[in-house]
Amino acid sequence: MSLINPKVSAMFFDQIVTATDHNIAWEKIQNLLYNLYGEATYNSWLSSLKFVSSSNGEVLLSVPTRFIKEWITVHYMEKILLLWQNEDKSICSIDIQVTEEKNSSSSIISKNKEESVNNLGSPLDPRFTFDNFVVGKPNELAFTAAKRVAESIDPIPGSNPLFLYGGVGLGKTHLMHAIAWHIVNSPSAKRKVVYLSAEKFMYQYITALRSKDIMLFKEQFRSVDVLMVDDVQFISGKDSTQEEFFHTFNALIDQNKQLVISADRSPSDLDGVEERIKSRLGWGLVADINETTFELRLGILQAKVEQMNMYVPQDVLEFLARNIRSNIRELEGALNKVAHTSLIGRSMTVESASETLMDLLRSNHRSITIAEIQKKIAEFFNIKVTDMHSNRRLRSLVRPRQIAMYFAKKFTHKSLPDIGRSFGGRDHATVIHAVKQIENFIKTDSEFADEINQLRKMFK
């Protein structure tokens, strides 16, 4: 005599079959998601999704963190539901539960996230504040924009991201530190700020991949209120870092968080950076910091002397401002060097300053122009300067023209479009191609590399 109720047995068997069918369906859906979104996106967001159960037309999935749940719900849920319905018409909805995995980094994310955010960034330099920043025409827009971002609790429409660009030593990093200091010291706002270089962002990303803490990395960076990335040109050519930066950028913008980015050139001129990233970097306010004027350099020196509480004759300050034109770092370094002459009992005069800074002054006076580069390269290869501007594609002309473009990028502060215009109205893409060609030849052809080094000496 059987003690098993046939109806209960049949119901139990149906549930097993259904669960098995849905497990198979889920494996198929996972493959479809992988093919649909690609390896990087799948591994970043969808690989942690687990099938739990299904009943009464509802599928229950699980993820290890609340953050992943929210991201999937906003960005992928509609597609996942559609794929489920293609497999089983009875599925009406999907729910995601958060199930922390034991013995994994994801189980300690929420516990450590708050304190770890503070360890993400680089230390701030206490010297770099808005009060210590000398404003002039070349940096006025960048300063005003930076101050507005720092003082606003929420991102300002049209200023997110704030993108600052300019040559080395012109004040980009100073402004970024100033923004961070202002926010950190603001009594009214408790915003989490992270400032770091693009190089450190890449290093932390690689470390997270190696230690299998990638979800912790994602949560840390996506939980900040203000993310500031310095020298973003560093991610050029680094595909996986660019992919992660792209997703971090989008996540913060979607959450209405502020981004401040800096580079040594405008977004459109960032060679080796994906177009989709360059496009997003230009979404907000792009402010350039131009080369300093005499008046601005003199103002910087006067402010520095006041901070140092020391006396430097006005004619010496004017001499420095007139002759040290490369960047602010060199200008301040020159002032420090001249100031130290007083420690050995020498009087500070224009003559003593000129003697002390002989090498630096020589390099600053060596301002190389594109026209000079074209002339010297043309002479070296025994061609005409007009060949630099022509559209003739002879090999004997193309290579010297590319070399001249390469040196124009290396030795001048001109933008890529400006360089292209100086070579017969070519576009910036042509300049990029020329520079990459020369760089590749230098790496692969030792004789060519020697020739380039020989040419380089002509401009020193």
From Swiss-Prot:
Disulfides per UniProt: none
Region annotation Domain II: where it falls in the sequence: 91-122
A molecular-function term among this protein's GO annotations: ATP binding
Gene Ontology BP, a term: regulation of DNA replication
Binding site for ATP: 169, 171-173
Stored InterPro entries: AAA+_ATPase, Chromosome_initiator_DnaA, Chromosome_initiator_DnaA-like, Chromosome_initiator_DnaA_CS, DnaA_C, DnaA_dom, DnaA_N_dom, DnaA_N_sf
Pfam families referenced in this protein's UniProt entry, alphabetically: Bac_DnaA, Bac_DnaA_C, DnaA_N
Domain of life assignment: Bacteria
Principal cellular location given in the protein's record: cytoplasm
Alphabetically ordered keywords of this record: ATP-binding, Cytoplasm, DNA replication, DNA-binding, Lipid-binding, Nucleotide-binding
Region of interest: Domain III, AAA+ region: 123-342
Assembly: Oligomerizes as a right-handed, spiral filament on DNA at oriC.
Name this polypeptide is given: Chromosomal replication initiator protein DnaA
Gene it is expressed from: dnaA
